[in-house]
């Protein structure tokens, strides 16, 4: 039994350590960049939202080309190349102060993140450790993602308070490159005799994507809209209310701990209950938790339960949306790449819409008002698109 556990650990650890490092570095940077833009670059709220939003724009722009380019044989090279670009962007941030230069670095980071993570997720589904099922692989993947977010907030905020933003950015620059190398070594090259998927036109490949993939994209979009406005503007509002960077980082980490723990435990939960029944309550819970943040912004303790609820909502929604999408496409190598691209694309659109819309509304009415109103707007948009899509999917599922 111990030998079996050791074998499982050797198979799972490097792969999910890679996922952990990528997310930990990116999440820590996302917490610190708005503060850096405000304190060092002296940008206004609308400008901060626009610069941060460039990251999502660049990431989104690369998704579909990377998804179409992806194959099992190219995946490892894409992973390492993307990690190198993100590492370069992280390390250069504290060396520049101009708005244009910082915007370019956000774009470079978004490009690297897009290339690396699209390949990473597709490789994981194509060759999961020990042949694990998609649900198990996605549960561990989402759990490692949440764990990376959890550690990032504490480490990033504490290190920035102790050593300064400049040193912290240099340290974080190592995370995407080390993560890429860890997975590159553990996955290994594609088998020489592996069959190639049939080649179809790009437009046809997109049209043939199952409806479950598009529903998953909507889920990803919604959770990242809420997450991005919180990450971008809650630190600025909390600093003005008297919280320290360490406290802000701890709150971010609490949300991520709740998210990661729910993801690791999602397998047994969804084996007994229908995941679809949890979707609407989780969407509403995440919306309300975000809306109540400004009402208790001056209290570190009072914000803890709100961040816990937001983390639980995000974590469980991330697992269900991803697993359903990949189960729908089966073992098609091309569709693995495209599904990964589309799901991450939903997250990327959320990263764009959240900071930009948040910056515009906050610039006009203040951050507190924005955090109370904008989550409901995202909820209404999600309902308008997701409910008809799920209704259309039921007859298709019944015919299969």
Residue ranges, per PLM feature:
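Juxtamembrane intracellular "pre-TM" segments in multi-pass secondary transporters
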Residues: 1-9, 188-216, 400
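Helix-loop boundary and gating motifs at the non-cytosolic
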Residues: 9-52, 56, 214-216, 224-237, ...
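Residue-level signature of mid-helix packing/kink "hotspots" within the transmembrane helices
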Residues: 56-64, 149-150, 256-260, 264, ...
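Helix-to-loop junctions at the C-terminal end of transmembrane segments
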Residues: 62-74, 160, 262-274
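Structural signature of the two symmetry-related core transmembrane helices
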Residues: 77-91, 173, 277-292
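Cytoplasmic helix-loop-helix junction between adjacent transmembrane helices
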Residues: 109-144
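Intracellular juxtamembrane helix-capping segments at the cytosolic ends
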Residues: 115-129, 316-331
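C-terminal membrane-cytosol helix-exit motif in multi-pass small-molecule transporters
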Residues: 174-194, 384-389
